[in-house]
């Protein structure tokens, strides 16, 4: 298969996998709400947790992670770690800019975790450990996700992963941080909700 066709299939396939609007569907079917109009406006698991509940949030987390893992499988099937990276980045972008939701979506954290699990599971576990540490210290999901986004490329390098995967962690980490820009503003203002707070209860 020509390289251009492999790249196209990886990018398009990864994007379409990532764009599956899991949180939106769960919000509609389980809570009768449009997540784009509720809470933070994100369709990710954290907003589902705040606006719908724990069970639906866990479902969204698992399915969104599976989307990322499926993108890695697609890239692997195309025969090169570079196509893995292209498909993975496509999934990250697709989750936050879904063509089914007017190019809106979530923050791509769960999808990125699924990608890391399929790409380099030791890095995924270590990154998840950093996220858990952030939760234990602050109980703020966005802050913990930002810590994990910074840690992922460092852990890729420290654990000797291939260059394509290191570059994914760098690019994906920057993208996830950029997707959290409003959260960063609220963190600086001291108004970001903690776990257990409804959106309206935030300071």
UniProtKB/Swiss-Prot annotation:
InterPro entries, per database record: G3P_acylTferase_PlsY
Please provide, alphabetically and separated by semicolons, the GO molecular function terms listed in this UniProt record: acyl-phosphate glycerol-3-phosphate acyltransferase activity
> What is this enzyme's catalytic activity, as reactions?
an acyl phosphate + sn-glycerol 3-phosphate = a 1-acyl-sn-glycero-3-phosphate + phosphate
- Look up the EC number in the record and give it: 2.3.1.275
Where is the protein localized?
Answer: Cell inner membrane
Q: Which GO terms describe its biological process?
A: phospholipid biosynthetic process
- What pathway does the annotation place this protein in? Lipid metabolism; phospholipid metabolism
Topology in the membrane? Multi-pass membrane protein
| Protein name according to UniProt | Glycerol-3-phosphate acyltransferase
Q: Which organism is it from?
A: Synechococcus sp. (strain JA-3-3Ab)
